[in-house]
């Protein structure tokens, strides 16, 4: 039987067949406690929000994880590979309002749809471990974690300034404030103090920073981002007393406290900048309408660091002045500045234009003094004049009294000593990291298990009363949190004194839900949040996979939660993820015509032109970019599965480019992947029909065996290195070698072909598992499933390099090549080179002047005459 006439792979029939076989055998289940007879390996992809439809970015993410899981299983590991749903969140509430459907029903319907798609893709998931964060079985255990953290001093309640949407009656994150208005309601946002619950992540700031060094299987980029977010800064906290404060400025308002990393430049003080939310700014605004207007302008800018950084730097002179603690005779003005953040440091900065470009630009814009206190190397103190750029890098202090002549490091030490002696400051470590505010005025979230009693204060709900279950009989016909308007759920008796009390109606930030799910997967049906033997046996996650967009918040919160769970006795590990891989996005061209954006299936290529299918009219082709519903450049995984099969989708997302890079989704690429799968199936079927299973090896098959075993080694190395695209390339090469061997006759080639076909079944299994099972069933009927077989081992004798190709030059020009054993003696190489027919012809009659031999690389003959 030839390659072209062998039966095709009927994916519509065979993919469901093999999925049912795996399910029937419970192939991917593992016990809660890892087995003692083999090493464990925990593979986890960031679980999805159940929006209703998987997109091809999901397909890439989960395929990468599945390749790792299947490969490690074949390598003899006990592999846990679970799946769940990050199921709370605002989109469900929006759907409830827009579609008149309960968030719970909307969410669970979406989960059912997406689960079905994942199962059609053939992922090796242990579905018995499935969790959904919106179910009481999950969030009730989360409430227990919260009360335990409260008891351990890791939770506190305090007033916090928030972005309040007066129409939606809810708190908005900084990113949800656009031009001073709520992103959904459009209402002008108010700054409001609310009592909020905080998790004290700052308690772990130092270990969270230090232990980044241990995460050597994390991308350097992610570790750097976390390091900057945690933001450890050594410096000084300096108190600047108000110079001649006006009446009414009591002792809480008679000074400005500033954190600075450059106390050595205090003699360069030009101005003090305070946040629009600083108490001093609010005090000034009470009697100054212009100040109040400027503060309102700052509020409209929002509080997003990115927006503030990009905005024009503006300020308002309060008329107040402060004294320099190192030289009280010198004073400087206090400005409200739109670039000062209240939640970093003290909400105030001291401006030293000489050493900071932003301060220099601000000072020159408002014609403020620019004291020169930093002298660059090679400059003369008598003649140096600061130009348009602030001084950076090495410098010496001058015009700075007792600091003159010192370098900045030595000057910092002396300044801090002087400030502490004066009672005007002290050396401190400041953190950019802030405690995590977890209160959200939302219904569709985990209820915070607190009861507020006028007598007892906030009381944690006792363990025996957990979970606090969300009521289902709520309505969304008015603004605000439906829990506030549900009297039978809200009003309860105090667990301590029995008096009337009310439940906390805020729910957890949904980042809480995703901060410990990896631990719950280890014992998802337990009555406690974790089972120590299970959690400590499986954790940390060996390979975590997800997008770079989660590099900071989710990953940092998960690291914090792991430490908090350790401190409260739920875990014995400190880091949740030993290995992290951040995959790139899937992109697609965009298409549009006069009617607007078009879906990819609405266009087709005709020669060099792209036209609309139904009209044949040309369309405009945009660049390949992130898929988005607005530009309709999306592709449905379901459509791909139905047209080409799951294995085609899996193969394509692995083969195009390194997984950390963005990849372009193309119809041509998918079609090529489908053709390869069919070619491979026909090839293996042809070998099965042609070559007897008991064929003996012989010399005729040596070349193919060499390719086969080198492919085994190369694919294993590629999967260990997380470069599946390289594995795909090597499998293409082995497939081509096997196809070429179909034309060879002789003793030994049949056995080599069967070996190559069998190896192709085993090596393609992590990527195209259905096809691999089907090919093996054709090649070895009635034998074990591929998923139950070990990974093949490469035989060393076939890995050794048999020969090297050496170029032969005459006067530097390549005239031929020879094959010789590696590291062959020079005399042997030169003799072979002179015997090469073309070289021998060209050397005839010439005088050899010099013979140059570079071992294993090249021979060059220098001739004359």
From Swiss-Prot:
One Pfam match, by short name?
tRNA-synt_1_2
What GO molecular function terms would the record report? aminoacyl-tRNA deacylase activity; ATP binding; leucine-tRNA ligase activity
Under the heading PROSITE patterns, the entry gives: AA_TRNA_LIGASE_I
* Compartments (UniProt record): Cytoplasm
**Which BP terms does GO give this entry?**
leucyl-tRNA aminoacylation
What's its EC?
6.1.1.4
Q: Which InterPro entries match?
A: aa-tRNA-synth_I_CS (IPR001412), aa-tRNA-synth_Ia (IPR002300), Leu-tRNA-ligase (IPR002302), Leu_tRNA-synth_edit (IPR025709), M/V/L/I-tRNA-synth_anticd-bd (IPR013155), Methionyl/Leucyl_tRNA_Synth (IPR015413), Rossmann-like_a/b/a_fold (IPR014729), tRNAsynth_Ia_anticodon-bd (IPR009080)
Q: Where does ATP bind?
A: 629
GO CC terms in record: cytosol
Chain location of the short sequence motif 'KMSKS' region per the record: 626-630
Does the entry feature the keyword Aminoacyl-tRNA synthetase, yes or no?
A: yes
> Where in this protein would one find the motif 'HIGH' region, according to its record?
48-58
The UniProt entry, under SUPFAM superfamilies, shows: Anticodon-binding domain of a subclass of class I aminoacyl-tRNA synthetases, Nucleotidylyl transferase, ValRS/IleRS/LeuRS editing domain
Annotated signal sequence is none
UniProt catalytic activity = tRNA(Leu) + L-leucine + ATP = L-leucyl-tRNA(Leu) + AMP + diphosphate
Where does it mainly reside? cytoplasm
Q: Which PANTHER family does the record match to this protein?
A: LEUCINE--TRNA LIGASE, MITOCHONDRIAL, LEUCYL-TRNA SYNTHETASE
Give the family per the record.
Belongs to the class-I aminoacyl-tRNA synthetase family.
| Name listed for the protein in its UniProt record | Leucine--tRNA ligase
Q: Which gene encodes it?
A: leuS
